[in-house]
């Protein structure tokens, strides 16, 4: 088999979701070394290291022949690599290997949740271009959330058990918290403004959030648009609505309690100021401005999911 890439770099954290990271790296390297003439294993010891390595790759201080990047980790680790690639305009394909608490975007890439199987799938993968959300000065691949989403993310980051289960970020969050904290908001999408009061808001680029899939059949991270969902009340009807698949043309007609707005440019302010979760990382507070960057990043995508 001809190796399609010259030099690949595999980034990983010692504290990823894998029980034995060193054996895991060995298994992954078997597949990736078949794709690259030279494979470098790069440990990220501290948050921000991956972004620094991206700068070094851009300046060719790391090496002058790097032509593919790999990441072993969850959505937060992937988010760091996405920010490094976007900040330093690295026009390099990225292969994603699941290894964290949540691996939502690997589902979008049709990759298996098992790291070994996913790395084998990369052997027959192809690069596709995906949209990126620019949120203030940060970059986001999958979602932006506030309200109940942040509370759940903080529970996970604190190391406590995920009390909301697989569908944590959407369905069970609404069902479980009986007295959520509400906030006033002013949301402008492509020049149209909506104001109101809510306890949860989600802006999605990808269709998979918190282990579950948003039941919007035409939601795509390759269409140049972001999808905003505003949760208006906390009745159990919302949970039922969430589980019913529909397309964007009839969402607002048949869905009670969740408004859907699609667009390319979003501004959001709240009272009081709210923490913002971006791909599982709580790095911002409102107000925020979101711009969709169409097909801004290349990700290796499997031809079909290997179940």
Swiss-Prot record:
<feature type="domain" description="DAGKc">
    <location>
        <begin position="3"/>
        <end position="139"/>
    </location>
</feature>
<keyword id="KW-0443">Lipid metabolism</keyword>
<keyword id="KW-0479">Metal-binding</keyword>
<feature type="binding site">
    <location>
        <position position="44"/>
    </location>
    <ligand>
        <name>ATP</name>
    </ligand>
</feature>
<dbReference type="GO" id="GO:0005886">
    <property type="term" value="C:plasma membrane"/>
</dbReference>
<dbReference type="InterPro" id="IPR017438">
    <property type="entry name" value="ATP-NAD_kinase_N"/>
</dbReference>
<keyword id="KW-0547">Nucleotide-binding</keyword>
<dbReference type="Pfam" id="PF00781">
    <property type="entry name" value="DAGK_cat"/>
</dbReference>
<keyword id="KW-0808">Transferase</keyword>
<keyword id="KW-1208">Phospholipid metabolism</keyword>
<dbReference type="GO" id="GO:0008654">
    <property type="term" value="P:phospholipid biosynthetic process"/>
</dbReference>
<dbReference type="InterPro" id="IPR016064">
    <property type="entry name" value="NAD/diacylglycerol_kinase_sf"/>
</dbReference>
<feature type="binding site">
    <location>
        <begin position="74"/>
        <end position="80"/>
    </location>
    <ligand>
        <name>ATP</name>
    </ligand>
</feature>
<keyword id="KW-0444">Lipid biosynthesis</keyword>
<feature type="active site" description="Proton acceptor">
    <location>
        <position position="281"/>
    </location>
</feature>
<dbReference type="GO" id="GO:0004143">
    <property type="term" value="F:ATP-dependent diacylglycerol kinase activity"/>
</dbReference>
<dbReference type="GO" id="GO:0046872">
    <property type="term" value="F:metal ion binding"/>
</dbReference>
<dbReference type="GO" id="GO:0005524">
    <property type="term" value="F:ATP binding"/>
</dbReference>
<comment type="similarity">
    <text>Belongs to the diacylglycerol/lipid kinase family.</text>
</comment>
<comment type="function">
    <text>May catalyze the ATP-dependent phosphorylation of lipids other than diacylglycerol (DAG).</text>
</comment>
<dbReference type="InterPro" id="IPR045540">
    <property type="entry name" value="YegS/DAGK_C"/>
</dbReference>
<keyword id="KW-0418">Kinase</keyword>
<protein>
    <recommendedName>
        <fullName>Putative lipid kinase SERP0390</fullName>
        <ecNumber>2.7.1.-</ecNumber>
    </recommendedName>
</protein>
<feature type="binding site">
    <location>
        <position position="225"/>
    </location>
    <ligand>
        <name>Mg(2+)</name>
    </ligand>
</feature>
<dbReference type="Pfam" id="PF19279">
    <property type="entry name" value="YegS_C"/>
</dbReference>
<dbReference type="InterPro" id="IPR005218">
    <property type="entry name" value="Diacylglycerol/lipid_kinase"/>
</dbReference>
<keyword id="KW-0067">ATP-binding</keyword>
<feature type="binding site">
    <location>
        <position position="220"/>
    </location>
    <ligand>
        <name>Mg(2+)</name>
    </ligand>
</feature>
<feature type="binding site">
    <location>
        <position position="101"/>
    </location>
    <ligand>
        <name>ATP</name>
    </ligand>
</feature>
<dbReference type="InterPro" id="IPR050187">
    <property type="entry name" value="Lipid_Phosphate_FormReg"/>
</dbReference>
<feature type="binding site">
    <location>
        <position position="223"/>
    </location>
    <ligand>
        <name>Mg(2+)</name>
    </ligand>
</feature>
<dbReference type="InterPro" id="IPR001206">
    <property type="entry name" value="Diacylglycerol_kinase_cat_dom"/>
</dbReference>
<keyword id="KW-0594">Phospholipid biosynthesis</keyword>
<keyword id="KW-0460">Magnesium</keyword>
């Amino acid at each position: 088999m001809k190796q399609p890439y010259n030099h690949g770099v595999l980034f990983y954290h010692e504290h990823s979701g894998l029980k034995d990271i060193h054996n895991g790296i060995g298994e992954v390297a078997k597949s990736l070394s078949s794709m690259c003439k030279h494979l470098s294993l790069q440990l990220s010891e501290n948050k921000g290291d991956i972004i620094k390595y991206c700068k070094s790759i851009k300046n060719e201080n790391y090496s002058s022949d790097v032509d593919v990047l790999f990441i072993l980790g969850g959505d937060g680790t992937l988010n760091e690599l996405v920010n490094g690639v976007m900040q330093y305009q690295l026009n390099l394909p990225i292969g994603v290997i699941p290894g964290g608490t949540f691996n939502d975007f690997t589902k979008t890439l049709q990759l298996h949740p098992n790291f070994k199987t996913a790395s084998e799938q990369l052997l027959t993968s192809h690069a596709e271009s995906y949209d990126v959300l620019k949120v203030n000065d940060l970059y986001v691949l999958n979602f932006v959330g506030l309200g109940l989403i942040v509370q759940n993310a903080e529970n996970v980051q604190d190391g406590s058990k995920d009390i909301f289960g697989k569908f944590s970020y959407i369905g069970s969050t609404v069902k479980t918290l009986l007295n959520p904290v509400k906030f006033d908001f002013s949301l402008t999408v492509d020049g149209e403004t909506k104001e109101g009061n809510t306890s949860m808001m989600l802006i999605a680029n990808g269709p998979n959030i918190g282990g579950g899939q948003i039941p919007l059949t035409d939601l795509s991270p390759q269409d140049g648009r972001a999808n905003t969902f505003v949760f208006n009340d906390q009745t159990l009807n919302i949970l039922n609505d969430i589980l019913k698949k529909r397309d964007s043309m009839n969402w607002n007609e048949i869905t009670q309690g969740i408004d859907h707005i699609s667009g390319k440019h979003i501004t959001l302010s709240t009272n009081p100021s709210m923490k913002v979760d971006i791909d599982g990382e709580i790095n911002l507070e409102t107000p925020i401005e979101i711009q969709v960057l169409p097909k801004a990043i290349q990700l290796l995508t499997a031809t079909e999911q290997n179940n």
